[in-house]
């Protein structure tokens, strides 16, 4: 996908490049399906048909019914829509339980709900970054209306067993809503929706453009669901506003494309991840932050010497692009690493490398070579 062989893009957890075939679908849709899907005349009817086809394609990758799939503008909107809408369906309590390593688009809506009188309990992860399921379940009782947990952490790649969590939550309180942020999981790990009520995904993490996402909303909730904003009757009245048909078609194309290669990509990603881990063993200062059960697409480590922004700038001079934390937390220390109990030096020197199917061993080797030079050169300057 990259046109420049000298450029090594290793920040795919932040965003991915739009696949050429996806861009082609969007370009064609903009020219051929320009009519409003809600219009009653011929071009509008054809747009509606294309929208329904795209919805069905995305729904198939999640294993849900088409009518349970709602298009949004991004994963953050999906999270907000799910959380703020779902709590309005429950009046029997005020309890909310959430993991301590959630994305800001989950954290901040829940902080706002806490100001409104909801009892929000934040459960820290274990020191290795994995979900402390037992502690989360300890807080689920008859007054718990919502439990939220991401499926794959965006900073360290932790894979959480949300299917088991959802089953255990429902066993304790069948009326508790379970929300899952699957933005980093979709098209990387299998998703089973059993016992999950709402689930969010995003296009720009799977080689679709920014500006398109989706929300799975179970039929169990839809009748009582009250969205936080109002308008037209698009998306069954739950997400008002004229649908972005070209991007919805692009999302469907991207998801369909990646669904065919999940197993082969997983094998390739594991090889790249292992190559990077082996290469980092040459640096005694380096501490791996990603746990063993992390998805292979993400490897987070601390080099415990040079501040992240300095090392990132050094790497960027050679057109090697990685990150220090979540792009959505720009300029802020990693709350995930802090929740894991990492010390300030480890947090300040953390680097996240994240792969996609277009990356190669040469990308890893280029990173390691430049990183080695940086460790030598930048430490001399610091001294």
Tell me what each language-model feature is:
Residues 1-383:
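Pyridoxal 5′-phosphate
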């Amino acid at each position: 996908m990259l046109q420049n062989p000298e450029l090594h893009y290793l920040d795919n957890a932040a965003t991915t490049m739009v696949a050429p075939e996806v861009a082609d679908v969007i370009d064609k849709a903009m020219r051929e399906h320009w009519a409003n899907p809600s219009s009653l005349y011929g071009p509008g009817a054809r747009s509606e048909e294309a929208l329904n086809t795209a919805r069905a394609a995305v729904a198939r990758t999640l294993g849900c019914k088409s009518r349970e799939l709602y298009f949004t503008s991004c994963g953050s909107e999906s999270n907000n829509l799910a959380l703020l809408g779902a709590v309005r369906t429950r009046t029997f309590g005020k309890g909310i339980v959430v993991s301590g390593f959630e994305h800001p688009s989950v954290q901040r809506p829940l902080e706002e709900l806490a100001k409104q009188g909801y009892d929000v309990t934040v459960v820290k992860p274990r020191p290795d970054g994995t979900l402390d399921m037992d502690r989360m379940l300890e807080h689920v009782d008859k007054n718990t209306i919502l439990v939220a947990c991401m499926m794959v952490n965006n900073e360290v790649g932790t894979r959480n067993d949300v299917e088991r969590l959802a089953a255990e939550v429902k066993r304790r309180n069948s009326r508790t809503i379970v929300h899952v942020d699957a933005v980093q999981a979709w098209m990387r790990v299998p998703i089973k929706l059993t016992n999950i009520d709402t689930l969010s995904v995003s296009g720009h993490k799977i080689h679709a453009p920014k500006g398109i996402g989706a929300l799975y909303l179970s039929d169990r909730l839809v009748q009582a669901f009250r969205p936080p904003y109002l308008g037209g009757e698009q998306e069954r009245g739950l997400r008002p506003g004229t649908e972005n048909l070209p991007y919805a078609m692009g999302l469907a194309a991207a998801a369909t494309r990646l669904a065919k290669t999940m197993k082969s990509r997983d094998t390739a990603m594991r090889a790249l991840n292992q190559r990077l881990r082996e290469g980092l063993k040459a640096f005694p200062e380096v501490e791996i932050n990603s746990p063993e059960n992390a998805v292979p697409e993400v490897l987070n480590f601390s080099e415990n010497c040079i501040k992240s922004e300095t090392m990132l700038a050094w790497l960027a001079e050679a057109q090697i692009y990685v990150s220090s934390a979540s792009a959505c937390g720009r300029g802020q220390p990693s709350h995930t690493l802090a929740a894991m109990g990492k010390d300030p030096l480890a947090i300040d020197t953390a680097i996240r490398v994240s792969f996609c199917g277009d990356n190669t061993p040469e990308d890893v080797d280029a990173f390691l070579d430049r990183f080695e030079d940086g460790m030598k050169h930048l430490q001399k300057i610091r001294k």
